[in-house]
Structures are given as structure tokens and as C-alpha cells.
Regions:
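Elongated, amphipathic alpha-helical interaction scaffolds
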Residues: 1-308
């Protein structure tokens, strides 16, 4: 996983959309039943209608109910590492543009902050001293304001992975790290994703070498789990590499076999032509070699066989 916060959170939300909404927008997630489906809106679907500046941080998710009990709902999720880069006006423009593009008023904007946004407004109101003509607000999730101790045993994988980003006393740093690792082990069974999100935990935990040594001493089970993640991921990678290598080797072998078969067939055809020329004409070896593409030595050997 690259050390790009925007991409890290995009991957996280796209891999676990329900759990992401449960953590980042619990007031909305409370109304989602098990039948709802999550569909990420690809950037390709938006580029023709929206400016590229809208596509850097935003993650649109379309929520639908197959039985039609509720109208589709569009979530717009932004992640900001630097609160200073957040613009509520930009989010409002983007939300309105998506509403127009998808012909819906059912849009829920959500912003996830990795640092406390001291100056980021929670809403904007356009109007004058007499009337408000446009009011826009959004759901804001400030990770460092969430109490990490409340999520130590959470069944929500997104919450467990984000424990290092939450608020906790310094003495709990390694316990927070260990809980995130245990959550990854118990809540995600895919080895590829285990390795992928172990890196996510490491990026945000900021464990130095001394702390890692203490962690390995005090949390041996979790340290062994981390080693197991990496080893299984590497073993699967080697197995995939071996299978791909065998397949490529087989394909190359078949291709080479066909080439060799064609070469043998062509050579046998040249020998047959040379034999006919020897039997039916007085041509010498050099002339036959020129006409058939055989070497003079091959022509002479063929002539010797005919004589025998």
C-alpha cells in the first residue's frame, strides 16, 4: 500500500464500504439494512461532466435497495490529511454537481479528517440578514477526536484499522497497535488484504524501532500474527509466480514445439525435393543445395544414402 493517505483511504472505503459508513457516518449507517448494495462510482463516469479537481479526494458511493423499498442514496466521502486543504464550498459544489448528474436530491456528504480541523466550518449559509437562501452542511468524522479505548474490541474492521488514528493516552500506544492487528486477524480472512492492511496499520501507528522491540516482547502473539501475515502473503505470491511460470513455460513449449515441427516438415520437404532432383536430373551437389536451401554436406549425405 503506497504511503499516500488519499489512496489509502480510498482503498479502505472501497474494500469495506459498509464498515466505513458505520464508523464515519453512524447516524446514516443506522438506517442501512442488510439488503443494501454498494456501488463505487468510477471516475470515468464523472470526468465528462465534472472537473478533475473534484476527483482527487472524493469517493462517491451509490447505495441501492434491490427491492425498491427506498430510493437510491448517494454518499460523497472526502478524506483530508490536512484540514487546511478542505473547502466546504468545493464540497457543496461537488455535491450539487453529483445531484444534478444523477438526477437525485438524495446526497449525503461525509468528510473524514485525520487531524482536528480547527478552522473548517461545519456548514455554510448563503443569504442576507433577512433570509437564508442556501444552507449546506455535512457529516464530519474527526478521527483524532474518537476515543480509541471504545473501539479496542470493535467488530468493525475499519474502526480497528483506524485505532492508531484515534485519540488515546500515550501509554496505550502499543495496546492500540496490538488491538488493530488482532482485529485484522479476526475480521479479515483474505491473506492479500491482511498483508495490505497490515501496512495500513504500520503507516498510521508510527512505531519506531524501540517500540517495535517492546511490542515483540509484550505482545508475542500479535507479533507472530504479523509475521504469519507476511509469510502467508509471500508464500501465496511464490505459488502464484510458480503457476504463472509453469503456464508461461507450457505456452512457450507448445509454441516452440510447433515451430520445431514446422522446421522439421520444411527440412523433410527440402530433402524430398533434393532426392527427386538427384534421381531425375544430372545436377551436381552445389546446384541442388542452392535450389533447396540444404547444405552441400546434407546433399552429399543424401546422395550416399541413395547409392547404398
Amino acid at each position: 500500500m503506497p504511503d499516500s493517505h488519499d489512496q489509502n483511504f480510498k482503498n479502505l472505503i472501497l474494500d469495506y464500504p459498509r464498515q466505513a459508513l458505520e464508523l464515519f457516518a453512524p447516524e446514516e449507517a443506522a438506517h442501512l439494512d442488510d439488503s443494501v448494495t454498494f456501488t463505487p462510482i468510477r471516475e470515468e463516469q464523472l470526468k465528462d461532466r465534472l472537473s478533475d479537481r473534484f476527483l482527487e479526494l472524493d469517493i462517491p458511493l451509490l447505495l441501492e435497495w434491490p427491492d425498491g423499498r427506498r430510493e437510491a442514496l448517494l454518499f460523497v466521502i472526502e478524506q483530508h490529511t490536512d484540514p487546511g486543504s478542505f473547502s466546504v464550498h468545493k464540497l457543496a459544489r461537488y455535491s450539487l454537481s453529483l445531484a444534478e448528474l444523477f438526477d437525485t436530491d438524495r446526497v449525503v456528504p461525509v468528510v473524514v479528517f485525520l487531524k482536528s480541523p480547527r478552522r473548517a466550518p461545519e456548514q455554510i449559509v448563503l443569504g442576507n440578514e433577512f433570509f437564508d437562501y442556501l444552507r449546506f452542511r455535512y457529516i464530519r468524522c474527526v478521527l483524532p477526536e474518537l476515543p480509541g479505548e471504545q473501539y479496542l474490541e470493535s467488530p468493525n474492521l475499519v474502526a480497528r484499522l483506524n485505532l492508531p488514528n484515534m485519540h488515546w493516552p500515550p501509554e496505550l500506544k502499543l495496546a492500540i497497535y496490538a488491538s488493530a492487528v488482532r482485529g485484522l486477524e479476526s475480521l479479515e480472512g483474505n491473506p492479500d488484504k491482511q498483508a495490505k492492511y497490515l501496512e495500513f496499520i504500520d503507516i498510521y501507528a508510527h512505531i519506531d524501532n524501540n517500540e517495535r522491540m517492546l511490542f515483540e516482547q509484550n505482545y508475542r502473539k500479535e507479533a507472530a500474527t504479523m509475521t504469519g501475515f507476511v509469510e502467508r502473503h509471500e508464500a501465496i505470491g511464490k505459488e502464484k509466480g510458480l503457476q504463472e511460470g509453469l503456464q508461461q513455460g507450457l505456452e512457450r513449449g507448445i509454441e516452440r514445439g510447433l515451430e520445431e515441427g514446422m522446421e522439421r516438415g520444411q527440412h523433410e520437404a527440402r530433402l524430398a525435393t533434393a532426392r527427386n532432383l538427384m534421381l531425375k536430373t544430372p545436377m551436381d551437389n552445389a546446384t541442388i543445395a542452392d535450389l533447396t536451401g540444404l547444405s552441400e554436406a546434407e546433399v552429399q549425405a543424401l546422395r550416399n544414402n541413395i547409392r547404398d
